[in-house]
Amino acid sequence: MDWWTKRPDNEPRSIRGRYSRPAVSEITDDLLVGEYPRLSDLDWLKQEYRVSAIHNLQDDIDLHINGLDEAELRNECGRLGITFVRTPIHDGSADDMAARLEHALQDLDGLMDGEKRVFLHCNGGLNRAPTVAIGWLHANRDMSLEEAMHYFKQRRPCGPFMTVLEGHFGSRDQKPAK
């Protein structure tokens, strides 16, 4: 099918090429951020990047568009010994990010506390996952939001919801409360 022919509404329209692997960026020794994985990418993530946990921020629409099934992802992760956590956040919605940020941070923190090597992803790894990762860096690595954002952007291009993070944590220049 070409770019101009409308696909049926129920047909998946993956944002990645059929045979390409997800782009992965190492943010810290135990936190990686990137594009969504397919079932066929899970073992590759485990072997190539030593991933032991996946934190998925895709909502149901994202899963459908990309031809993914949560139960299949969860089952394959279980078979491979990878912990799978999903915190769905609607793509492009600052309001949904603000509403779900605390839950996403708690889920990520739980994985990181478990001494896992975590792969955090949304669709493209450009907005939702970076926002959560920057918030986690701020809260757990003694960085201001500004420092956390610059640290992250040195490792991966992104467009995080900084206004959501400021609304949640306070000023960009403020270090986390101890």
Provide a role label for each language-model segment:
Residues 6, 12-15, 85, 127, ...:
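Short, intrinsically disordered low-complexity segments
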Residues 20-22, 27-117, 139-169:
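Cysteine-based protein phosphatase catalytic domain of the PTP/DSP
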Residues 160, 177-178:
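Residue-level signal for secondary-structure boundary elements
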Residues 168-177:
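The feature captures the conserved acid-bearing segment of alpha/beta-hydrolase catalytic domains
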